[in-house]
């Protein structure tokens, strides 16, 4: 028997079947670095329209976690897809390098500043620590396949950036937004510093819940207000609080002007409460026998005075809109030094902003004999005992409630009035302008807009000063007597900024005021405060984007971070940009959800359900991690587990196998010589290119809308359905058995070439390593990297006016699906082995029959059977299978007649009819020794 294997065009490629990504990716990365791929892309895109995604800086502390990976991969997908869309999209990664977590790490190792090291040496250690953290994180980000200017990232501790942060503050001061005040701010007693909103987390805490009676100073005046004369015992206004330790700072009681307040007689005394809360309060304090003597509106009680239970002074009743009927008594204990609402109303009434608590959370000397020097949280029990002793405690119970805690220490924080510097929200209309700017930004998902609007509408002034060592100095001089800013503040700040640009922030602490103030130095003091780190990162639109040459003066198009950044980086950036420039720093803001495990639980080391990106890359490869990120709808929580990653790996194999099939069948194809013109191609091949064109339209639209899970779904559908289960199956016969240089085969290769050129580009933003690998095996002249080009423009489709248009082939797909069902049943019944052992008769109604007949003898190639005939629907025998999908179709199957050709495996009647090739069929004889078969349709 002759060996006809050598006459077949068998697929061949060096592109490996297995990805072996974990082993292969590091080598590709080394090549990208050696070639300076990022630089090559920048050179290729120079002069094109820009798209700037500004990197929100991760904090330079610790290893990257799965959330970091999600963030950086999403950014990279956008930057790469924009590049393919014809944009110049430079990506400059950044790091947030100042602030408390780094100080704490350095303190753990070296002690607090001033103990073993001077403050200057401590700062140097902080800088050193941050630099090592940046290096560690950078390696992992690069390993993810993220392309960017990793050799020149921006660090908020770069001298130039530190100088520009000072300049940003100068601009805000120049625009009139800064003010100084003793305001209550979130204060961590462990950090001994004010905290930003974004540094506060809420945890459950158990506190004493108490009802306290403040006795009226003028009992008769109150009786008159309520129109009563017979009251048994003293009259008191009752407050409710869960922070007894704040009572020494009480300076008023707030009530609502429009609520009804009742005077209630209980045993031996009368109490004033909101009428709607009388029943619940009586229940709480265990009183069943009570009488309401009278009611008045809250407004009637304004400025009546009540005695503080133990501080020896009296306080007024004042009117406030913040009073609610949700809980308590309808009368709110008001301590302007310990709460923002209290502070605001205190300002209105000219109350003292008392702050009896020191930075370490203990009462200052002279507060109250039994409280001086006591930690405020330990003082709760002392205050309760004191109230009991004075007869002012109506009720006490333990209550669990959500309480603000320090994000770093996880310990409860306090509101504490301290002299601080604030960016005012309303002094110069910053709030109103910010709310206006929000409307001009595209928020993705769109609920982000309402979220940040409500935060901006309700937020207090921003306390930007911190009492820290490792941070950008505020660089201010204030008069030692008046505490007013120096009249030449802006000029002086620029002078400081110039020095910081050369020597870093240490230049401020080394600065002798005389050097820039001259004789005035004796009248002014240097402000020791540093800036909130959110000011550092929030000003990068100015300190980085405005000054980096690759951004060429363009503002950022997009900020992209986790959804917690509405109150973090998105907010601080908006505040600073609006305060500096009157406009938002971004055009689009995209947020992604947090990662959770397969059961939807938050990632936690204690539960042991964390997924380490380093482990995933070392086991499965970065492309699997990238595919998981792209496949997941990032607008909600993003579930990840070993099982979910395994599914991503399965999807990856499908895409890789499709790419490998294309490459293997492009063996020996030179696009410069072998390309077939569209009008000369086999119709099915043109249809396949048209499928790629339709897929590309959907995929590009999804990339444009940042719907990456749609990109992956469409890519998978194209690989699995249109290609895998239809086209790629059908063409194997023609591809392998036709004459190597025939139009029939070259037409097919032309289609595969166009499809591969498009597919490799669709993959590139997501499966960057694999796309680079595929690119290296594609035939034809090309640039070295897929990332320097644009979407493929060589696709074309069938015209609707053609008889065999897309609708024609869509119907054929359905017919083939129905035939496959019949073949599968026959295989299960052991009537046939493979589909080529079958011959089918399609009984079809006239319209469908005409379409099927149009394919002539080539219908069998579409159906992958050795025989296919078309007959009248009404002639179908009883055992023909009625199609469930196409009502006008029945399918009958019989065993194919003739012998099996050992070359093409088809069963035909003409095997051995040609003496010189006695073992093969007539079609194969033509392909081996004759002019070759002609194919028009399939």
Swiss-Prot record:
L-isoleucyl-5'-AMP binds at residue 561. InterPro entries: aa-tRNA-synth_I_CS, aa-tRNA-synth_Ia, Anticodon_Ile_BEm, Ile-tRNA-ligase, Ile-tRNA-ligase_type1, Ile-tRNA_ligase, M/V/L/I-tRNA-synth_anticd-bd, Rossmann-like_a/b/a_fold. Gene3D superfamilies: 1.10.730.20, HUPs, Valyl/Leucyl/Isoleucyl-tRNA synthetase, editing domain. A motif ('KMSKS' region) lies at residues 602-606. Zn(2+) binds at residues 901, 904, 921, 924. It holds the Pfam family tRNA-synt_1. Keywords: Acetylation, Aminoacyl-tRNA synthetase, ATP-binding, Cytoplasm, Ligase, Metal-binding, Nucleotide-binding, Protein biosynthesis, Zinc. A motif ('HIGH' region) lies at residues 58-68. It catalyses: tRNA(Ile) + L-isoleucine + ATP = L-isoleucyl-tRNA(Ile) + AMP + diphosphate. Its cofactor is Zn(2+). One of its GO terms (cellular component) is cytosol. Disulfide bonds: none annotated. The modification N6-acetyllysine is found at residue 183. GO terms for biological process: isoleucyl-tRNA aminoacylation. Its EC number is 6.1.1.5. CDD domains: Anticodon_Ia_Ile_BEm (cd07960), IleRS_core (cd00818). Monomer. Belongs to the class-I aminoacyl-tRNA synthetase family. IleS type 1 subfamily. IleRS has two distinct active sites: one for aminoacylation and one for editing. The misactivated valine is translocated from the active site to the editing site, which sterically excludes the correctly activated isoleucine. The single editing site contains two valyl binding pockets, one specific for each substrate (Val-AMP or Val-tRNA(Ile)). Catalyzes the attachment of isoleucine to tRNA(Ile). As IleRS can inadvertently accommodate and process structurally similar amino acids such as valine, to avoid such errors it has two additional distinct tRNA(Ile)-dependent editing activities. One activity is designated as 'pretransfer' editing and involves the hydrolysis of activated Val-AMP. The other activity is designated 'posttransfer' editing and involves deacylation of mischarged Val-tRNA(Ile). PANTHER family: ISOLEUCINE--TRNA LIGASE, MITOCHONDRIAL, SOLEUCYL-TRNA SYNTHETASE. This is Isoleucine--tRNA ligase. It comes from Shigella flexneri. The lineage of its organism: Bacteria, Pseudomonadati, Pseudomonadota, Gammaproteobacteria, Enterobacterales.
């Amino acid at each position: 028997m002759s060996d006809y294997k050598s006459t077949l065009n068998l697929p061949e490629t060096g592109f490996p079947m297995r990805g072996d990504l974990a082993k292969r990716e590091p080598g590709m990365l080394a090549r990208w670095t050696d070639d300076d791929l990022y630089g090559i892309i920048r050179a290729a895109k120079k002069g094109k329209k820009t798209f700037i995604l500004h990197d929100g800086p991760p904090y330079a502390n610790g290893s990257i976690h799965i959330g970091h990976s999600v963030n950086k991969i999403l950014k990279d997908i956008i930057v790469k897809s924009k590049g393919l869309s014809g944009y110049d999209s430079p990506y400059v990664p950044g790091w947030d390098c100042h602030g408390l977590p780094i100080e704490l790490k350095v303190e753990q190792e070296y002690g607090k500043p001033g103990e073993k090291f001077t403050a200057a040496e401590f700062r140097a250690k902080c800088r050193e620590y941050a630099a090592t953290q940046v290096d560690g994180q950078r390696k992992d980000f690069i390993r993810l396949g993220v392309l960017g200017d990793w050799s020149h990232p921006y660090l908020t501790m770069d001298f130039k950036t530190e100088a520009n942060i000072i300049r940003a503050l100068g601009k805000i001061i120049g625009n009139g937004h800064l003010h100084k005040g003793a305001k209550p701010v979130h204060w961590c007693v462990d950090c001994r510093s004010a905290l930003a909103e974004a540094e506060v987390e809420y945890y459950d805490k158990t506190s004493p819940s108490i009802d306290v009676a403040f006795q009226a100073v003028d009992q008769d005046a109150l009786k008159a207000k309520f129109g009563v004369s017979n009251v048994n015992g003293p009259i008191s206004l009752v407050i409710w609080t869960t922070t007894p330790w704040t009572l020494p700072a009480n300076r008023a009681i707030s009530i609502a002007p429009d609520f009804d307040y009742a005077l209630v007689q209980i045993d031996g005394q009368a109490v004033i409460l909101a009428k709607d809360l009388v029943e619940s309060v009586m229940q709480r304090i265990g009183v069943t026998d009570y009488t309401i003597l009278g009611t008045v509106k809250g407004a009637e009680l304004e400025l009546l005075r009540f005695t503080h239970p133990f501080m020896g002074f009296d306080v007024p009743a004042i009117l406030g809109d913040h009073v609610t009927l949700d809980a308590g008594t309808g009368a709110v204990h008001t301590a302007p030094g310990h709460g923002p609402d209290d502070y605001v109303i205190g300002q209105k009434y000219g109350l003292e902003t008392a702050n009896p608590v020191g930075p370490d959370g203990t009462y200052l000397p002279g507060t109250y004999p039994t409280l001086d020097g006591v930690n405020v949280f330990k003082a709760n029990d002392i205050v309760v005992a004191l109230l009991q002793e004075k007869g002012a405690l109506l009720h006490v119970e333990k209550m669990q409630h959500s309480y603000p805690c320090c994000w770093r220490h996880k310990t409860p924080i306090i509101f504490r009035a301290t002299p601080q510097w604030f960016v005012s929200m309303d002094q110069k209309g910053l709030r109103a302008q910010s709310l206006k700017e929000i409307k001009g930004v595209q928020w993705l998902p769109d609920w982000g807009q309402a979220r940040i609007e409500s935060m901006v509408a309700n937020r207090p002034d921003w306390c930007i000063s911190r009492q820290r060592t490792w941070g950008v100095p505020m660089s201010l001089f204030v008069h030692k007597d008046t505490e007013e800013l120096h009249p030449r503040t802006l000029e002086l700040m620029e002078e400081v900024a110039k020095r910081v640009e050369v020597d870093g922030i240490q230049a401020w602490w080394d600065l002798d005021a005389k050097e820039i103030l001259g004789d005035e130095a004796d009248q002014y003091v240097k402000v020791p405060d540093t800036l909130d780190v959110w000011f550092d990162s929030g000003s990068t639109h100015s300190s980085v984007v405005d000054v980096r040459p690759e951004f060429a003066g363009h503002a950022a198009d997009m900020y992209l971070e986790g959804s917690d950044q509405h109150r973090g980086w998105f907010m601080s950036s908006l505040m600073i940009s609006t305060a500096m420039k009157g406009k938002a720093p971004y055009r689009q803001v995209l947020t992604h959800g947090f990662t959770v495990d397969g059961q939807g639980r938050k990632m936690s080391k204690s539960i042991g359900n964390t997924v380490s990106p380093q482990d995933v890359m070392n086991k499965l490869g970065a492309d699997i991690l990238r595919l998981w990120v792209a496949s997941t709808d990032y607008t909600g929580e993003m579930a990840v587990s070993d099982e979910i990653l395994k599914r991503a790996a399965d999807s990856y194999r499908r895409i890789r196998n499709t790419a490998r099939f294309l490459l293997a069948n492009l063996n020996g194809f030179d696009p410069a010589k072998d390309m077939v013109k569209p009008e000369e191609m086999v119709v099915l091949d043109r249809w396949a290119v048209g499928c790629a064109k339709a897929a590309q339209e959907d995929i590009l639209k999804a990339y444009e809308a940042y719907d990456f899970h749609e990109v992956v779904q469409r890519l998978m559908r194209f690989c699995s359905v249109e290609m895998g289960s239809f086209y790629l199956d059908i063409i194997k016969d023609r591809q392998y058995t036709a004459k190597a240089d025939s139009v029939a085969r070259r037409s097919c290769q032309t289609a595969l070439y166009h499809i591969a050129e498009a597919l490799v580009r669709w993959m590139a933003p997501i499966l960057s390593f694999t796309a680079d690998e595929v690119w290296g095996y594609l035939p034809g002249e090309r640039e070295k990297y897929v990332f320097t080009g644009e979407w493929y423009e060589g696709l074309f489709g069938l015209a609707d006016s053609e008889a065999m248009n897309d609708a024609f082939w869509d119907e054929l797909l359905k017919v083939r699906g129905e035939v496959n069902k019949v073949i599968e049943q026959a295989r299960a019944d052991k009537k046939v082995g493979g589909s080529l052992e079958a011959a089918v008769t399609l009984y079809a109604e006239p319209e469908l029959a005409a379409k099927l007949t149009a394919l002539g003898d080539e219908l069998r190639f579409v159906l992958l059977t050795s025989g296919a005939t078309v007959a009248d629907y009404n002639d179908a025998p009883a055992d023909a299978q009625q199609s469930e999908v196409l009502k006008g179709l029945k399918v009958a199957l019989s065993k194919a007649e003739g012998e099996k050709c050992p070359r093409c495996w088809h069963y035909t009647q003409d095997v051995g009819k040609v003496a010189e090739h006695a073992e093969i069929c007539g079609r194969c004889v033509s392909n081996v020794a004759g002019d070759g078969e002609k194919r028009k349709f399939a």
